[in-house]
Amino acid sequence: MAPTLLQKLFNKRGGGAASAQARPPKEEPAFSWSCSEFGLSDIRLLVYQDCERRGRQVMFDSRAVQKMEEAAAQKAEDVPIKMSARCCQESSSSSGSSSSGSSSSHGFGGSLQHAKQQLPKYQYTRPASDVSMLGEMMFGSVAMSYKGSTLKIHYIRSPPQLMISKVFSATMGSFCGSTNNLQDSFEYINQDPQAGKLNTNQYNLGPFRTGSNLAHSTPVDMPSRGQNEDRDSGIARSASLSSLLITPFPSPSSSTSSSSSYQRRWLRSQTTSLENGIFPRRSTDETFSLAEETCSSNPAMVRRKKIAISIIFSLCEREAAQRDFQDFFFSHFPLFESHMNRLKGAIEKAMISCRKISESSLRVQFYVSRLMEALGEFRGTIWNLYSVPRIAEPVWLTMMSNTLEKNQLCQRFLKEFILLIEQVNKNQFFAALLTAVLTYHLAWVPTVMPVDHPPIKAFSEKRTSQSVNMLAKTHPYNPLWAQLGDLYGAIGSPVRLTRTVVIGKQKDLVQRILYVLTYFLRCSELQENQLSWSGNPSEDDQVINGSKIITALEKGEVEESEYVVVTVSSEPALVPPILPQGTAERRSPEPTVVAEISEGVNTSELGHKPEKNRCKRPEQNSEASSMGFQEAEPDSSWIPQGIFCEDKQNDQEATQDCSSSPPSCEVPRVRRRMDQQTLHSKLHGETLKKRAEQSAAWPCPDRHSQEDPPVEKVTFHIGSSISPESDFESRTKRMEERLKACGHFHGASASASSSMDTGLTQEQQGSGCSFKADFEKDITPQDHSSGGEGVSEDRGLRANMTHAVGQLSQVDGPLAHSLCAAESGRRLLEQTRDVQLKGYKGPSSEPVPNRCRQQGGLLIAADVPYGDASGKGNYRSEGDIPRNESLDSALGDSDDEACVLALLELGHSCDRTEESLEVELPLPRSQSTSKANVRNFGRSLLAGYCATYMPDLVLHGTSSDEKLKQCLAADLVHTVHHPVLDEPIAEAVCIIADTDKWTVQVATSQRKVTDTMKLGQDVLVSSQVSSLLQSILQLYKLHLPADFCIMHLEDRLQEMYLKSKMLSEYLRGHTRVHVKELSVVLGIESNDLPLLTAIASTHSPYVAQILL
């Protein structure tokens, strides 16, 4: 009954809010997820305990809780609980690990005396029949000795449920009472015959459990975590605060203007790379505290115990509604995890406090009511976040993603902007609000940094940054994380998380202010790319079956019994087609080294970082490819050298000092050192024989000798490849035949020009391995100047070939093998002094059309993207890499992107002859589809006019500050303790603009407000912002075009940035500077200092240390 009433209330409220347009112009309603099938009662809480001595026990199941009638609950109110109330009050004030503040009267740590008057009465009945299976899923097979926390997500098909569970190791104090009395209380209170006794043995999943209780399920997307929880959510810590204060990472730009934005992304890539080891998380997130701070712990008496908390969302039967909620859940996972941590803190407090109560029935009443209160808050927060009306078209994101209607957007925005300047700037209200937003939401700073081209071009092309796009491809990070950090303004140093709330009874006015602010709250636009089949496989193609595992919960024949059904169904996987026979005959010997990549994973996501760049072991797949077989005349000789392979014994060979160049697979550098007979016998004889016989990787010459395992022993995972026995022999024979034919060709053609063939056979979609070919030989200076360059780039695959054109007749002798070599950009440039890559400064940021070039007898195979079945070269944009990818509209072009553009021009101007031959590379037949307006943080956390205050939203409006006053302090503390960005946060900030009182205040987690009438400190209006508003107003009154006025606005913002640069340069080397000195020397007024200091913190962290 109660949930139904709440549902009606919420639906009514949500409907009223949804009818409100998110901005004054009458257009389509603001989008929100459909919540008609999603109710508060669909969110279920399950708490489990696993103890060495007692086994597994259900500590709480919200489905087993029923609210008792007031009359039946009247007797229980008269029991005195004064003594325990004092104990609980002390424990709530001393428990610092919880995120809920005990200062607020409604908090979970309130006194029991207060609870005595308002404590709702609940009856805890027998838990549902599926708790045993769910408990098995929650705990899994993690050992009791494991100290860290584990996070899992399960999707149960029937009935449709999504379960997120977190398992903590419990820490207990030995002198503060036993935790067993709570479970004993449940057994005591459930001796009621109608409710049924809660038999401990029945729900004890300890050593005496039966096979029928075992459950099996396949986790979705996020397997159980190791000590570091960051891997699963994809939202990990970026830099710690200390790392932002040290010398910044050099960006590709000569200017350090974007160092913080660029550096955050680069450090993010480093932090989330498994190659750099596991970063331990904060201990408060790893453990579940059952001890008060005043209790001492006796290690001899503490037994191992784990607490598991699980939130289960019951989904609608309709697939579209399920898909909507899953989209919402996985895209907003950091917010779910943050609120789950808050719920965990409430459960910790409830468990600690209820132990002080001696009477069993009261203990359970207190515990259950506290957990139901915490669950109610969790339910309300998630439901509001799901159903809140969003701003349909945020100005900045729409302007950056929609170029066709940019003029109309500029006109509409400018009209609303001028209205606010003229009507709302009473008491400098609007100037104060804009000052606060520009001071704390700092993602606008990288968008106004200076660029080399004219301002009109700068404004129209500001939506992308080539250098950051290049970084996203070579050192991937989660784009949702980057977007969330931009929105919260977590760019400066120290890192601050900022939210803005506009309060007012005038709905239209609040909506107008929210709409205008979406121009200044900037973030990256995201584009979602998905792979799909393109056409049916031809008869020459290999068709292999992958496996799809479906888990369902079915009703059993016995009453109240359920069991798990695991269905394994076959579905076709993306496979590479076999090359046409005619094409294959013209090719050089078939290459035989490749790294196996699991489906849907880009190799650049597997840990390619500027440090320790290495290639995967070559023996990982029976189907192989390599690069750079060289056919040549037999009168001179080449020897491979400089090979690096990924091996623990050879880690020191990996490059340590390097730039952000992508990892490379380098074909051996070769010099004319040995005579022809020695090389021919060494390469063509022994080595090729060994390759044909066992198909193992060639050992590195300079690493420890080891016997590589034969390829037949490779284990093939579900959907990864076909059986090696099916095709191994035929491929080996075919390779031998081609090698023999190649040998005959060497002997017959003494004067033939050399040719090189780059082949790649790729069995999995999404391979992003990067190859660089580097042929080095002793040549004359004129040869050095005649070296050409071919850059072929598609879908993360790069083959850069340098060759000497003038002396090709001297290039001869067979090059029979090529191996992967890890090399960074800096080392590559050092090692190619003889043949220099002209203009090569790193990976190009745009694709060069892939063509086969035949020049001086040199044949280079072109990449045909995705193995198009028709054989046509479909040269797609490189932006179609099949994964979520950040266009990074929040980052402007860097100063030095001219060198990247020069590289592109060089690549496009490379001469190509008309007789170039196209050779199709065998890549999966698939096509990429892109969705620009995916429902991400940028469009989800910028909300409209809401019925109540919301803690997660970056921007929203509401009619009253009543709930804001109650919750704000606890929310700010929680944000610092459990930040959604998963990195240390120095300060949490909330900007509160009240249109009824015309005040703008800033509340922070660091300063306590002494005035009870105020929520925070008043904002000091910046003279820079005031003059900006006046100049825009004057230009508008002169009837200048809207886009010109917007350009002027951008110029004024850039002027603020340049003043902050000037301030940082002046303060360099100083320890203390007086404000009057700054005013006289730099012309900076005192009311501008907070704004300019905040801007300077994005590029010069020392400024804040000097001035603050």
From Swiss-Prot:
| Post-translational modification (record) | Phosphorylated by AMPK.
Which Pfam families does this UniProt record tie to the protein?
FNIP_C, FNIP_M, FNIP_N
Cite a single GO BP annotation. intrinsic apoptotic signaling pathway in response to DNA damage
Q: What happens when the gene is disrupted?
A: Mice lacking both Fnip1 and Fnip2 show enlarged polycystic kidneys.
Q: Where in the cell is it found?
A: Lysosome membrane; Cytoplasm
Interaction with PRKAA1, as annotated region: 540-905
Main location per UniProt? membrane
Q: Which InterPro entries match?
A: DENN_FNIP1/2, FNIP_C_dom, FNIP_fam, FNIP_mid_dom, FNIP_N_dom
Alphabetized UniProt keyword annotations? Cytoplasm, DNA damage, Lysosome, Membrane, Phosphoprotein
**Chain segments carrying region Disordered:** 89-112, 209-233, 598-635, 649-671
Question: Ranges for the dDENN FNIP1/2-type domain?
Answer: 1044-1099
Record-annotated membrane-spanning stretches: none
- Where composition is biased (Basic and acidic residues), the residues are 606-620
Q: Which residues carry this modification: Phosphoserine?
A: 212, 217, 720-721, 723
Which PANTHER family does the annotation name?
Answer: FOLLICULIN-INTERACTING PROTEIN 2, RE13835P
Q: Name the family the entry cites.
A: Belongs to the FNIP family.
Q: Which proteins does it associate with, and in what oligomeric form?
A: Homodimer and homomultimer. Heterodimer and heteromultimer with FNIP1. Interacts (via C-terminus) with FLCN (via C-terminus). Phosphorylated FLCN is preferentially bound. Component of the lysosomal folliculin complex (LFC), composed of FLCN, FNIP1 (or FNIP2), RagA/RRAGA or RagB/RRAGB GDP-bound, RagC/RRAGC or RagD/RRAGD GTP-bound, and Ragulator. Interacts with PRKAA1, PRKAB1 and PRKAG1 subunits of 5'-AMP-activated protein kinase. Interacts with HSP70, HSP90AA1, STIP1, PTGES3, CDC37, BRAF, GCR and CDK4.
**Protein name per its UniProtKB record:** Folliculin-interacting protein 2
Record organism: Mus musculus (Mouse)
Q: Top-down, what is the taxonomic lineage of the species of origin? A: Eukaryota, Metazoa, Chordata, Craniata, Vertebrata
